[in-house]
Amino acid sequence: TELLQMVTEAPQRVFEIGCGSGATGHALKQKFQGIEFVGLEPDANAARIAESRLDKIIVSDIEKVHLEAYGLKKEYFDLIICADVLEHLYDPWKTLFTLRDYLKPDGKVIASIPNTQNINLIINLLNGHWTYEKHGLLDATHVRFFTLNEIEKMFTGTGYKIVRCSFAKQPKLENIRWPATIDFGKIVLKNITREEATRLFVVQYFVIAQKNIS
């Protein structure tokens, strides 16, 4: 997956929020031998599976847990993973600020976050629809919604600097002369740049943010 590919250097200690059944941790432990991987997962059934794959499992909600009560030390982890997690939290800002304390001075957070600026959502909203679904951009369990600008503000406002932000390639935009006019029927975007258009087609952003100690 894109998220696994973003981990290019072997971390010593990793903490994943919402680790599920431990698939990501299992893959990273195979990729990098000898790493310590701690997972937090609120679903007891998924956590039970993860126990056999990871070094330590905390069965709890990140917004309610006291991490020190589980023996986690400050400035301990090289990497914290939040894959499709932050949009499910009532206060992701507080969570990121808290997690910062558990990162080493040069530690990083990797996160994947849905893009609410996606053109399909905008068109549906124009037509009066904002229909929640079981999966996808309007997953019924999402409680926060982010554009790229808001993602950047969230990380910088909680003590991080973004070192990389990526997304899946957009082949639809390859053979267009920019700036361009793009006609979506009821919506016509005039004199739009490639960067502006890209933000409308991205489904999910992949962010690497480093603890800011300056």
Describe the residue ranges of each PLM region.
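Aromatic pocket-lining residues of Rossmann-like dinucleotide-binding sites
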Residues: 28
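Class I SAM-dependent methyltransferase SAM/SAH-binding core
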Residues: 23, 31, 35-66
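Conserved class I S-adenosyl-L-methionine
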Residues: 12-20
